């Protein structure tokens, strides 16, 4: 594998992890600024090598998948995200791109708004009556939060006024003002309840309560900023006009919305808002800048995951100084040992910060960090900040060096650092309690074996009570044993047992991904499954044979080979099969031999599928010899268009590319 391929793999793995924590669990571990930096780095590398862009890259999608505790709702019009800029130069470059695409030398009129730090929602009104509300989710599918949204007093249950469209989907942000956030935390401290890290987490936690009565007690509010579905009516032909119309119908709109007729005016707006930020009474992390004219918006169109006519201009991450009191070491799923700085607690952007990740030994060396040092930390709205630098001029005399452990802090096994890698790892494997927990959490996750209802807290208890040591042990659990866990009644226990039984029927690619082999993500697992066809063939493959799989280089091939060479891993796999885990035999990829209409073709999926998940469709297409791409180009052979297919479908039609619908895809797949 080329160095750039290795970088791309690591970046995508890291970004997917943090997307899950942020969008699904509402428990982010890194600041927005660090996530944005990682995304910029990934975009830059993919721009250098567009041939290495994969359909499942974070740059080719909108967000993350929703939880299954709520009913899922498919957005008829996808809820796209915005691209970001971080400085004046980048904004001016964006402004120029817009003018160049419009072939205009005249200034564009911009509509500028606050970028609220809350939770994006969609609210559907039919004949003026609120009938449905959903979270953004992954942009295509969200969670049904209608009952909770109805409790927010700022959101009208019925619109007022005349000429209201028959179906109108309003989009906006639910957020928690600072005063309400402080009140919730005060009450939590008194009652021993959960104290939220910041207003965004509090808003998300409040909005996603299964009991609407809890949501009703939280002082949530809402500003609208856009529209999705529009049927049986008309709206003004400018963005500002639409916001004013929403306000006339009784929907709340920020009073800081401003029209700017030049890029200089936009910059002035940005700096004014930045200056006023501490006095607003609620959290924002930048401003949103949109082309005001709807006709020009339509002319500009969209890229894969964002409109070309809008951008988020984000504020710089906020910084404070504090002291490092100690460094502890945490162990992850693959044995990676991560140093964590324990800080003298300090308020950063309204949140009390007491720890920061230090990533690895190289980062500690780069910083020249010692325990007791005064450091600058940076935070951009989330929980765990980053250490920017050491204030050497104020280094206390009593500092001491940070000593990386030679044995795992959890299980006592030896640690190793492979030459050329930055990460130090525990060699204990599944005898290590920390690795065991994280491995099992990965195994049951939605994109792996998809065991509904088996959350992190259940896994923690199962490992701590020594009920489970390997993934195979999960399938031996009984409802009686599960009932003994905290907050687990007989009905819930039986539901988990049923979910485990259901999960036994999987597909080969998911099973491989669930095993947690280093560097083997979903795309690589699908490629391995499709190429070798059977578990036996994959287990017997040499490193050279493994490298014949598309996008598998020497590093990944070595990890896969070593995994299957380990007797304990083969034993666990045998136990899983003995417990009834099974999958249909995949078709081996060989475009010359496969009798399939998809063999050797580059296929693009767009829109929502109703009969099959997108992941399963991709896996099946790959098994039948297709290459699934994330964007439409002249090299695309076929586009499969589901419901609410958007710009990809339009581009396919423009290029004269063959298009089929979901029903035809299922027929060709033999489903």
Swiss-Prot record:
Assigned GO CC terms: cytosol
Residue span, BRCT domain: 593-671
CDD domains on file: BRCT_DNA_ligase_like, LIGANc
Residues that hold Zn(2+) according to the record: 408, 411, 426, 432
Membrane-spanning ranges: none
Domain of life (superkingdom): Bacteria
Gene3D superfamilies assigned: 5' to 3' exonuclease, C-terminal subdomain (1.10.150.20), 6.20.10.30, BRCT domain (3.40.50.10190), DNA ligase/mRNA capping enzyme (3.30.470.30), Helix hairpin bin (1.10.287.610), Nucleic acid-binding proteins (2.40.50.140)
Record keywords, A-Z: DNA damage, DNA repair, DNA replication, Ligase, Magnesium, Manganese, Metal-binding, NAD, Zinc
Pfam families: BRCT, DNA_ligase_aden, DNA_ligase_OB, DNA_ligase_ZBD, HHH_2, HHH_5, Nlig-Ia
A single MF term (Gene Ontology): metal ion binding
Active-site residues (renumbered): 115
GO BP, one annotated term: DNA repair
Keyword Nucleotide-binding included in the entry's annotation: no
Catalytic activity of the protein: NAD(+) + (deoxyribonucleotide)n-3'-hydroxyl + 5'-phospho-(deoxyribonucleotide)m = (deoxyribonucleotide)n+m + AMP + beta-nicotinamide D-nucleotide
InterPro entries in UniProt: BRCT_dom (IPR001357), BRCT_dom_sf (IPR036420), DisA/LigA_HHH (IPR041663), DNA_ligase (IPR001679), DNA_ligase_AS (IPR018239), DNA_ligase_CS (IPR033136), DNAligase_adenylation (IPR013839), DNAligase_N (IPR013840)
Positions with a binding annotation for NAD(+): 32-36, 81-82, 113, 136, 173, 290, 314
Cofactor(s) the protein needs: Mg(2+); Mn(2+)
PROSITE patterns for the chain: BRCT, DNA_LIGASE_N1, DNA_LIGASE_N2
Cross-referenced HAMAP family: DNA_ligase_A
PANTHER family: CHROMOSOME TRANSMISSION FIDELITY FACTOR 18, DNA LIGASE
Family of the protein in this entry: Belongs to the NAD-dependent DNA ligase family. LigA subfamily.
Name recorded for this polypeptide: DNA ligase
Lineage summary: Bacteria, Pseudomonadati, Pseudomonadota, Gammaproteobacteria, Enterobacterales
